[in-house]
């Protein structure tokens, strides 16, 4: 462990500094109280290394401010100490050394000229020798080339050296006139603007701290501030360097962090903020949002696929309820996050669109129409039955009222007869008691009530027979619905044929109708929806094998499709087409689910 730590420490440190560094590293790496993962986390968690680094940086900045304050408080003393040291002696020494170098330079030039003349003489002698001796041609030409190249290189080096010396001499001669002002003006200016200079130099570190602590809005503000400084001071190398460092922090650390956040389970407001931050920094701060949309949908697709894969289907086939629950959760993930991702971008940014139409599946459309036709006929029959029942109930209520009236009259008649008999028969009044009279009246009323009940039963039986006969008359054979539909189709064809159309007009009408059905659609968003739907359906077919799904699952898929229809009708048609192409559900199941959904929300149009 000590060998590893010693290799990490620089050799430029003193023994005391090395000892302090070793103690600090051992305290961190061999601590029993600190968790390794939580301590070395990249986030600003309390007790982590990020927080320790931030505290140390804060202490360093505090010390820098303290030093700066002491320098500003003692500005006059510092300037006095600097100006008291007269450097004329040093300048004189430099001038003397330059004079010596100048003399050396002139001597070298003279020697070079002499060498050039000697080389010319030698060249002449060589040419004579070449003329006299042809066998030495190769050796002499090689020697001539080497001498010429050496002379040119020497002249070039001497010329550069001579230029450097002349520049230095000119600089000293110009500054001899104002020796008292040397370094005074620039130093005073730097000390007066020391606060602004230090603030400017701390901008890259401040941007890095804001990004690491999650203050992205402040980091974006720093980036805009540095760009404004570059426009205000276009020729300043210091400002350019500061801007480049801030841009490097923004385009690497901040960009990668925000893009990674797009592939996590974040809320709608967080998604909006992340997109706004990305839209304000390069490379997404251009005129169009196409690149931002591509990156955003790619990361959201990664998150959606990971969420769908987190609900496995590798459970026992006997546990159908658990399988159905997992399938419904997958569909719920698709419905929620696809809609949320598209809706956030649609509401916040501009995007390119093209007129496009994805037609409703023809097989599914025919089955839906057929089911709707049968349902309408059933509704008509039910309404007719309800109206007939209401009529019969009214008739029964009228008959019951009449029977009640007749019963009341019969009771009153019996009572009158009894009273007449009581009054007329004085002799038999002693024999008959009041109880006997009451018994007679009760028996008579009971006999009449039994007769009336028998009559009511007979009338009800007759009414029921009449109802059955009427219902049998109303019943339609299985062939009649299709005949009615065929009749409707024939009538529509006749109406179309009645309209006179020139040879050029049909194509125009067809084109106009197609244009009316087309709606503006973004190709990247449509591709995103297609990929998500395909992934879910493939995952279901691969995980379920031969297990059949219930109608409730089909209904939930249809709900998901109608949810996407709120954004764009083409997404809805594409979803239904994808479901119909798979073997998960039959066309009848899908049509019934659509019809069921239409009962709850009749505002949706299927084609």
From Swiss-Prot:
Residues 375-514 are annotated as: Disordered. It is found in: Golgi apparatus membrane. The keyword Zinc-finger does not apply. Keywords: Golgi apparatus, Membrane, Phosphoprotein, Protein transport, Transport. Its main location: Golgi. Acts as a component of the peripheral membrane COG complex that is involved in intra-Golgi protein trafficking. COG is located at the cis-Golgi, and regulates tethering of retrograde intra-Golgi vesicles and possibly a number of other membrane trafficking events. Belongs to the COG8 family. This is Conserved oligomeric Golgi complex subunit 8. It comes from Saccharomyces cerevisiae (strain ATCC 204508 / S288c) (Baker's yeast). The gene is COG8.
């Amino acid at each position: 462990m000590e060998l590893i730590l010693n290799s990490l420490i620089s050799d430029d440190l003193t023994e005391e500094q090395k000892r302090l560094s070793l103690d600090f590293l051992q305290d961190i790496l061999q601590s029993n109280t600190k968790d390794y993962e939580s301590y070395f986390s990249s986030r600003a968690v309390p007790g982590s290394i990020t927080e320790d680094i931030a505290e140390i940086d804060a202490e360093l900045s505090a010390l820098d401010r303290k030093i700066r304050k002491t320098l500003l408080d003692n500005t006059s003393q510092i300037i006095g100490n600097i100006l008291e040291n007269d450097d004329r002696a040093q300048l004189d020494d430099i001038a003397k050394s330059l004079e010596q170098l100048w003399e050396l330079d002139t001597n070298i030039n003279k020697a070079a000229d002499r060498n050039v003349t000697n080389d010319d003489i030698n060249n002449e002698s060589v040419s004579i020798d070449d003329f006299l001796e042809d066998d030495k041609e190769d050796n002499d030409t090689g020697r001539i080339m080497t001498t010429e190249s050496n002379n040119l290189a020497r002249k070039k080096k001497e010329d550069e050296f001579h230029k450097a010396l002349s520049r230095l001499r000119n600089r000293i001669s110009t500054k001899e006139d104002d020796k008292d002002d040397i370094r005074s003006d620039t130093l005073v200016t730097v000390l007066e603007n020391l606060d602004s200079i230090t603030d400017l130099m701390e901008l890259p570190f401040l941007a890095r701290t804001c990004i690491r602590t999650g203050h992205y809005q402040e980091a974006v503000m720093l980036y805009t501030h540095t760009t404004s400084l570059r426009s205000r001071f276009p020729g300043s190398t210091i400002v350019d360097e500061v801007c480049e460092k801030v841009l490097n922090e923004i385009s690497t650390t901040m960009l990668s962090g925000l893009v990674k956040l797009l592939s996590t389970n974040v809320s709608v407001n967080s998604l909006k903020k992340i997109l706004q931050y990305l839209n304000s920094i390069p490379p997404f701060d251009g005129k169009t949002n196409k690149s931002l949309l591509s990156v955003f949908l790619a990361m959201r697709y990664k998150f959606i696929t990971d969420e769908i894969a987190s609900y496995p289907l590798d459970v026992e086939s006997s546990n159908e309820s658990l399988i159905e629950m997992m399938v419904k959760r997958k569909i719920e993930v698709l419905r929620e996050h696809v809609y949320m991702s598209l809706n956030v971008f649609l509401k916040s940014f501009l995007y390119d669109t093209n007129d496009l139409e994805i037609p409703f599946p023809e097989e599914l459309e025919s089955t839906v129409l057929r089911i709707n036709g049968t349902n309408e006929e059933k509704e008509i029959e039910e309404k007719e039955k309800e109206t007939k029942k209401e009529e019969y109930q009214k008739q029964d209520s009228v008959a019951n009222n009449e029977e009640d009236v007749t019963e009341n009259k019969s009771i009153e008649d019996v009572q009158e007869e009894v009273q007449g008999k009581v009054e007329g028969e004085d002799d038999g009044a002693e024999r008959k008691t009041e109880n006997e009279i009451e018994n007679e009246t009760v028996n008579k009323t009971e006999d009449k009530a039994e007769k009336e009940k028998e009559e009511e039963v007979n009338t009800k039986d007759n009414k029921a027979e009449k109802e059955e006969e009427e219902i049998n008359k109303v019943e339609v054979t299985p062939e009649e619905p299709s005949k009615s539909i065929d009749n409707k189709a024939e009538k529509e064809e006749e109406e179309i044929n009645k309209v006179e159309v020139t040879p050029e007009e049909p194509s125009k009408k067809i084109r106009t109708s197609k244009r009316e059905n087309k709606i503006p659609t973004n190709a990247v968003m449509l591709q995103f929806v297609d990929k998500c739907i395909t992934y879910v359906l493939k995952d279901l077919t691969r995980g379920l094998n031969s297990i059949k799904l219930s109608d409730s699952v089909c209904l939930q898929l249809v709900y998901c499709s109608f949810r996407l229809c709120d954004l764009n009708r083409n997404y809805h048609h594409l979803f239904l087409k994808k479901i119909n192409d798979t073997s998960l559900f039959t066309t009848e199941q899908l049509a019934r689910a659509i019809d069921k959904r239409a009962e709850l929300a009749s505002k949706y149009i299927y084609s």
